[in-house]
Regions:
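Carbohydrate-active enzyme catalytic cores, enriched for enzymes
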Residues: 314-486, 534-536, 640, 651, ...
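CBM-like, beta-strand-rich accessory domains located in the C-terminal region of large
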Residues: 27-30, 159-163, 393-402, 492-666
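Helix-terminus loop motifs that line ligand-binding clefts
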Residues: 85-86, 135-179, 183, 294-309
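Structural helix-adjacent loops and short alpha-helical linkers that scaffold large soluble proteins
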Residues: 129-142, 191-214, 269-287, 324-340, ...
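Solvent-exposed loop and edge beta-strand segments that line ligand/cofactor-binding
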Residues: 55, 106-118, 130, 165-181, ...
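Active-site lining segments of carbohydrate-active enzymes
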Residues: 167-306, 416-427
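Bacterial Sec-dependent N-terminal signal peptides
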Residues: 1-32
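Well-ordered alpha-helical scaffold segments within catalytic/enzyme domains
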Residues: 120-136, 182-202, 261-276, 315-330, ...
Length: 666
């Protein structure tokens, strides 16, 4: 069988019971609390924030000797060597023709590769000079600063929709603030702050130019209150006359762009702005924006964008709070807030083992989080598990020889400064036995706490307009002995037509029914109902009705799904359905990383790479099975899963208006 999207070939005595009739009921009750501004006024920030010249969050060039005592000799030498490799760096040009690639053919990689490499180089050169302080990297640093200041736009072409004239070339008269304009602003602000007088000795206009460009491109734009969608203001005042699709899009709560950009805005203004009044108002304004992110945030701390985005969602929120805490000498401190703690702890609840994480929605199964970031966040909120997780990841990765990805000094400097503390901290892999996140409606359960041995299942309910949404209400993933068996394919490579990608369709998520070629629909109303979670001893049960994920007119009255995990024994997937009209075809997919053995009717055996195996049992009188081989053409997916995936298609026999079945995994 051939498909257009890929090459395909046919082949749980404590009882906790929570019933949710309406998704996000708890979370919505939280709206309007404005956590960050309780007692924190513009005047507070004016009085408490230190002057840029007095604030020394990390040793700058005038105290460069401190780094000799902070870093190990090996770490120090590696960082200097990285800078040495950039001596005489030929700063690549960001050409207009390459900038236009996105508008013309959807390619964003060509430009981004050039832009990011320039910033990576500048960051590495500054680290080298900061450690060594001999002046030999200064020419290249100045060239990098000037080169970046000369760019028409600090962001990327794919984000020019914020520009009045739309995508294409950047309008110098209409600077917009996207992720990477904000990142670049923060980079240059840190360079100015760290290098200080050393830049003035080359020429006083260098630091002046940095301020002028940040003021023009960032400060004044934000002060004009542009109400960008990432700021989260629009969702409160949506025109009721708009179509459902348009309203749904506008009503979505802001995603990771909000705290990510906010953290860079805060570092820029705290490091550069000398005017007390302006600085205080700007900080207050940024926190007003961040409140739009926190107010509707799920009260359970769950990140519906997935663990892959946690580093720029909850963790960027941490960056914001930590920056201002430092800048006010701890007068501003929100780390005792329960939501902030839960947001951080999501990361270990989403950890499966062996480097794998939950990857519902547009996330990847394996992601490299900064061990230091997890450790520091855990230390700030008093989470021993987070601290132990950070130390575990650091030791697993052979310490902190490598810097975190990207060019953010907001992340790199603490990574260096606290490195010895992290490497000597208590460590443990965070293998929790079970968890239930009621607001994002995600459950996880493993056979044995603190061990990857045996079965692990994660499942979700929710709705089909979650951040970075895939149509996956009712889906689940199964691991055995820490290895993936039934998977969520996860994120693919972003393109202009990514919204139409096969990875988003429910037809490629575990046991989500395809009924007469109809699949789950996209939108907030397409959601799970009658959701409940019960844990009783060694038995965990998760129930939901997924019928509302189809159009009302389709005639699906109910599709009740119960997932039961009997720890140490088996996982049961039990469904019962009811149609108002007769249906001809029902197919249940399962996504696999290995070719299964289906030689015995009623059994599908899936072998792991360690030669262990699990058996998925079904009634052969109810289903016949066929296997499709999916040759992966998306390099991002292939990087995670290899070149090939398999889709088991369970085709129902003798379809009636009412029915039920059970699949057993053991």
């Amino acid at each position: 069988m051939k498909k257009n999207f890929v090459s395909v070939k046919s082949k749980k005595n404590i009882l906790i019971c929570i019933l949710f009739m309406q998704f996000f009921l708890t979370a919505h009750a939280q709206e309007g609390r404005h956590v960050l501004k309780q007692g924190f006024t513009v005047d507070f920030f004016k009085q408490q924030i230190q002057e840029p010249a007095d604030w020394v969050p990390y040793p700058g060039i005038n105290k460069s000797m401190a780094w000799n005592y902070i870093l190990t000799p090996g770490h120090y030498a590696k960082l200097v060597q990285q800078a040495e490799g950039l001596l005489g760096y030929n700063w690549p040009v960001t050409r207009a023709s390459v900038f236009l690639d996105y508008a013309e053919n959807g390619n964003r990689t060509n430009f981004e590769k050039i832009s990011f490499s320039r910033r990576d180089a500048l960051s590495a050169l500054v680290i080298g000079e900061l450690l060594e302080n001999k002046g030999r990297f200064m020419d290249d640093i100045v060239d990098g600063i000037w080169s970046i200041c000369e760019e028409t736009f600090w962001g990327v072409p794919a984000h020019l929709s914020y520009q009045k004239k739309g995508i294409g070339l950047a309008d110098v008269n209409d600077p917009v603030v996207d992720l990477f304009a904000a990142e670049t602003s923060s980079l240059l602000a840190w360079v100015s702050h760290l290098m200080g007088d050393k830049l003035d000795k080359v020429n006083p206009l260098i630091k002046e130019r940095i301020y002028v460009e940040i003021d023009r491109r960032i400060f004044k734009v934000i002060e004009a209150d542009p109400k960008y969608r990432w700021m989260g203001y629009g969702r409160k005042n949506v025109d009721s006359t708009l179509s459902y699709k348009e309203r749904s899009f506008l009503e979505r709560r802001p995603n990771n762009w909000n705290p990510w950009i906010s953290s860079n805005l805060l570092s820029s203004v705290l490091l550069l702005e000398k005017n007390k009044d302006r600085r205080a108002k700007f900080v207050y304004q940024v926190f007003d924006v961040l409140d739009n992110y926190l107010d509707p945030y799920p009260a359970d701390g769950g990140c519906d964008e997935g663990p892959g985005y946690w580093g720029r969602a909850a963790a960027s929120t941490f960056d914001c709070l930590d920056l201002v805490k430092m800048a006010t000498n701890d007068k501003f401190n929100l780390f005792n807030d329960s939501l902030i703690k839960k947001m951080g702890e999501f990361i270990f609840k989403a950890y499966i083992g062996n480097g794998y994480y939950l990857n519902f929605a547009d996330a990847v199964s394996k992601t490299n989080h900064s061990p230091m970031l997890i450790y520091r966040y855990g230390k700030a909120v008093g989470s021993a598990t987070m601290m132990e997780m950070g130390a575990f990841l650091a030791n697993k990765n052979n310490g902190l020889v490598n810097m975190p990805e990207g060019y953010s000094f907001l992340r790199k400097l603490p990574e260096l400064y606290y490195s010895n503390e992290l490497l000597t901290a208590k460590s443990a892999e965070p293998l929790i036995g079970s968890a239930w996140l009621p607001d994002i409606q995600v459950m996880v359960s493993r056979d044995k706490e603190s061990s990857t041995k045996g079965l692990y299942i994660a499942a979700k309910a929710g709705h089909n307009q979650e951040s970075h949404n895939h149509n996956d209400v009712g889906s689940f993933m199964v691991f055995y002995n820490g290895k993936p068996v039934l998977i969520d394919v996860g994120a693919g490579t972003y393109t202009k037509d990514y919204g139409k990608s096969w990875v988003i369709s429910s037809a490629f998520h575990n046991m989500l029914p395809v009924i007469d070629d109809e699949v789950q629909q996209t939108g907030r109303k397409y959601s799970a109902s009658n959701v409940s979670y019960v844990r009783d001893g060694q038995k965990v049960s998760f129930k939901q009705d997924i019928s509302k994920t189809f159009n009302d007119s389709f005639g699906l009255n109910k599709w009740d799904r119960t997932i039961t995990h009997i720890k140490g024994k088996s996982i049961l997937i039990s469904d019962s359905y009811e149609f108002l009209t007769t249906k001809k075809n029902i197919m249940l997919p399962m996504m696999l990383v290995a070719l299964p053995d289906i030689s015995v009717p009623g059994k599908m055996v899936v072998k792991n790479s360690d030669d262990s195996s699990i058996t998925i049992s079904y009634d052969p009188k109810q289903f016949e099975i066929e296997i499709e081989e999916i040759i992966l053409q998306d390099s991002k997916i292939a990087h995670t899963w290899g070149s090939t995936l398999y889709r088991a298609k369970f085709n129902m026999k003798n379809i009636t208006k009412k029915g039920k079945y059970t699949f057993t995994i053991q």
